[in-house]
Amino acid sequence: MNKKSLPLMALRDIVVFPGVIAPVFVGRQKSLHALSNTTLSEEDNSKYILVTLQKKFDQENPNRNELYDVGILAKVIQIVKLPNTTAKILVEAIARVKISNIKGDEAFEANYEIIPDEEIFDANNMRSLVDNAVQLFAKYAGSDKKINAEIIETINKEISETSNFINIINILASHLITSLEEKQRLLEETSPFKRISTIINILTSNIVNSETEQALQQRVKKQIEKTQRDYYLHEQMKAIQKELDEDKSDLAEFDKKIKAAKLSKEAREKAEAELKKLRTMNQMSAESGVTRNYLETLLSLPWGKYDNSKIDINQAEKILNRDHFGLEKVKERIIEYLAVLQRSSKIRGPILCLIGPPGVGKTSLIKSIAEGMGRKYTKFALGGVRDEAEIRGHRKTYLGSMPGKILTQLKKVKTSNPVMLLDEIDKMGSDFRGDPASALLEVLDPEQNSHFVDHYLEVEYDLSNVIFIATANSYNLPRALIDRMEIIDISGYMEEEKIQIAKNYLVPKQLKMHKIKKDEITISDDAILDLIRYYTKESGVRSLEREIGALTRKALKQILADKKVKHISVDSNNLEEFLGARKYNFGLAEKNDQIGSTTGLAYTEVGGELLTIEALSFPGKGEIKTTGKLGDVMKESAMAAYSCFRSRAADFGLKYEDYKDFDVHIHVPAGAIPKDGPSAGCALFTTIVSLMTKIPVRRTVAMTGEVTLRGNVLPIGGLKEKLLAASRGGIKTVLIPEENVKDLKDIPPNIKSSLEIIPVSNIDQVLEHALTKKT
């Protein structure tokens, strides 16, 4: 075909199909110019124009690259100019065309070439597809309320007036409710079969969506009608009850409870006011539910209810000794506390706080205290608590509000004088929701807790009869909180104590738990000692109990699997057969006296340990280097020890030239374990002196103590645990600070008898006992 040129107009929101007459609103300048450039055709004295869809709807002035290259050759049937410089035109789409060579600035003009439809070879198949599409369109138009009835009638008329399949397809396509991009793809498609198939798919999808939307609307309508009906029936029932003057049983029950409860004057007035308010409320309202919950909570608290406890310190002492081995000083302090309570029902002394590592029996001690006092026991776990409302409660204006855990626990035990454990008090945090530690100050202060006000209750509640006892693993507590409590340290158990606990408590408990008779298994003391040393590493006995449990299960399995086995004996020789290879090792003394290697003593959260400190020297700048994952305090101890050595080098027969060009590298194995603290000063100094003087350190000597720059030895902590580690590791002599001699009275006699304990006050005394010869 010959190419021709015509004005081109970009359409924003409509795709016109061949054979369809469509109205077009023209408002953009380029479109108006293109319309004015149309001229009368010589053939039929009509105006023709090219129209095509722009690719982006919101593009105000699209360029030639932003127009689709397949459009329509249209005849302008009518032009109506509107007052606001716009126009409305009526166009008849003549044919689909390929647009090319677009040009022009004020108005587009382009060449075009008509694109014919492909020939229809199977008329019968096409007829059935077209009929199917027409039926689907009628069904969709009938189900979708968005399509006007007049439009449906017009479309049906257009379809009935033509027998041309292509025209029917174009009429259906022009009235489809789908995206402009989808319509443009239909226009560009030259195959009638593909076009009608796409139309059928779109209509089918639209029908499914329409039916789904209608079903959803119907369900929503029914739900609204049901809600309105229920509300009407409730209101009608209330009106009938009011006419009959019937009492509301639940409100009458509240009234009885208020009269029967031993409420304080303030609480009674508050309860009566809330009940009066509840009587006038709509029972279906949200506020009614809030008020009802408040009254239920207020009346469920144990107002004026106390256990008739009678403290007998002799009986309490028996209970403590029955449930706990060792811990003599701790039990003595608890008995003193109970003795004061026996004489005075209202104690104004400090709150007890038991501080010690996990598994040493802090929680079970408090249970025994409650039993010894004849009071109920309750627990408030503070670990991870960050919200102040956990202590003081939420104000009842908030959705889902409730009282704090203090009052919740009292409600649970139904008494106002229980023993309440504040567990893991050192694990509390604080964030934007408040500081629970500060909220606890009021609870733990004997001068204030008789007037404790929970935010939810909004009335005072007397907590002065509650015995609060806290537990913690460390001293990481706010200063103000520590001031309100008396700290009782619970150190870890000695090996001998663990053996007795295992024999008298843990083994019988596990045998009973696993239904094993005493004559079916025997665990020797040596096996228990190996369990403690090689399968656990703790201050308490929790892991020990787990290992004993594993041991008894293995034994039970053997007994049940082999009927010939009637008794199993476990000792140190066959322990690994039950529990596998050893998990831990403890430090042992060196096999030989070493130069530049000293045995120190460390105190960790799992007990005492031998700490090997070694050093090397090599050419350098006279500097000191430390490795072994040492903390800041221990690094500073090493620097202080090195400075002390350099100031005394002449006393050891060394000249400045002997060490000024040498670096000292101090290492503390194992390198992966963090270490910190000042008590390694003596060992660090001895290591440096031994290295520089080439005098070995006695392998049977261990030491602990902090060293000052002037060579004085300062006291340390954890002496009992350190001496136990020394005795266990084959150490014969231990050097301790002279100021720690007072602590030796707390050391078990068997430990003191196995060691030569030498007090030292300065570094000269340390070197005298530690080095194999005098410097």
Swiss-Prot record:
Keyword Zinc in annotation: no
Domain Lon N-terminal, first and last residues per copy: 6-207
A single GO BP: protein quality control for misfolded or incompletely synthesized proteins
Subcellular location field: Cytoplasm
InterPro entries in UniProt: AAA+_ATPase, ATPase_AAA_core, Lon_bac, Lon_bac/euk-typ, Lon_lid, Lon_proteolytic, Lon_Prtase, Lon_prtase_N
Molecular-function GO terms, alphabetical: ATP binding; ATP hydrolysis activity; ATP-dependent peptidase activity; sequence-specific DNA binding; serine-type endopeptidase activity
Pfam families documented for this protein: AAA, Lon_C, Lon_lid, LON_substr_bdg
Top-level taxon of the source organism: Bacteria
Domain (Lon proteolytic): residue spans on this chain: 592-773
Induction: By heat shock.
Catalytic activity reported: Hydrolysis of proteins in presence of ATP
Presence of keyword Amino-acid biosynthesis: no
Main location: cytoplasm
Keywords: ATP-binding, Cytoplasm, Hydrolase, Nucleotide-binding, Protease, Serine protease, Stress response
Entry function: ATP-dependent serine protease that mediates the selective degradation of mutant and abnormal proteins as well as certain short-lived regulatory proteins. Required for cellular homeostasis and for survival from DNA damage and developmental changes induced by stress. Degrades polypeptides processively to yield small peptide fragments that are 5 to 10 amino acids long. Binds to DNA in a double-stranded, site-specific manner.
Subunit comment: Homohexamer. Organized in a ring with a central cavity.
Protein name: Lon protease
Organism: Rickettsia bellii (strain RML369-C)
Organism classification: Bacteria, Pseudomonadati, Pseudomonadota, Alphaproteobacteria, Rickettsiales
